[in-house]
Regions:
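Structure-specific DNA junction-binding interface
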Residues: 1-99, 103
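Generic surface-pattern signal
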Residues: 33, 41-44, 48, 62, ...
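Alpha-helical ligand/cofactor-binding cores
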Residues: 33, 40, 83, 87, ...
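Residue-level signal for secondary-structure boundary elements
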Residues: 47-51, 80, 130-137, 158-162, ...
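Long, compositionally biased
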Residues: 69-72, 76-79, 164-205
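Membrane-interacting alpha-helical segments
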Residues: 102-120, 168-179
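Amphipathic alpha-helical packing elements
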Residues: 114-166, 170
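C-terminal structured domains
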Residues: 210-212
Length: 212
């Protein structure tokens, strides 16, 4: 009798490169760009609750021109964490007629732009987990368990989680000042070699996470 076998998860940089195509990389870059715009909006209004790598580098983030922001966004993986476990847990325990908790007005997704980005991230992660399961762990920067949970959601469940996912989204490696200062400087000076080194370092970190 046939059994459902979970798809193999990409765990090396080489496997990752072979399992994705230009279209998904373009989509990831677009997601990153939208998230960076939400981050810069939050920084420009001095919104509380932002990660260290945003707050400490505020002037660097806000000094970037559009071309430099696009260069920062150009990575084959999401530059934002989507930590959905709290949202999964809250959704399991919420009664059907129970309203979701009030939205926080802090952090990356405290305003409408950020909340829209959080919803989009949830739907993108769900679609990617379903359509490209082998590469999802590295593209999204999440573990295999989260990918499997996402893939099992139906649309109604996904929508309920997406509406309250703002607090689950944050800048990836948000405490790593070294990573972000180097990436921002490389983008500002149009140093393509340094940008590539930064991007590759991120792929290696996510590959290690996927193997864990």
């Amino acid at each position: 009798m046939a059994t459902d076998t979970p798809p193999a998860i990409t765990t090396t940089e080489t496997d990752f490169a072979r399992s994705v195509d230009r279209e998904i990389i373009r989509q990831v870059g677009g997601m990153n760009l939208r998230g960076l715009r939400a981050l810069r909006e939050a920084l420009s209004t001095s919104r509380p609750g932002l990660p260290v790598a945003a707050e400490s580098l505020r002037e660097h983030w806000l000094a970037l021109d559009d071309g430099a922001v696009a260069a920062v966004a150009d990575a084959p993986y999401l530059l934002f964490d989507l930590s959905l476990e709290p949202a999964f847990e809250a959704s399991r325990h919420r009664l059907p007629e129970e309203a979701p908790p009030p939205r926080a007005e802090t952090g990356l997704c405290g305003a409408a732009t950020g909340r829209g980005f959080a919803r989009l991230m949830c739907h993108f992660a769900w679609q990617t987990s379903k359509a490209r399961p082998a590469a999802a762990a590295l593209l999204l920067g999440v573990n295999a368990s989260t990918c499997n949970t996402l893939r099992a959601l139906d649309l109604l469940e996904l929508d309920a989680i997406a509406e309250t996912a703002g607090e689950c989204v944050s800048l990836r490696w948000g405490a790593d000042l070294r990573f972000w200062s180097r990436r921002l400087d490389a983008a500002r000076t149009a140093d393509r070699a340094a940008l590539w080194e930064s991007t590759l370092a991120g792929v290696q970190r996510l590959a290690a996470l996927a193997r864990a």
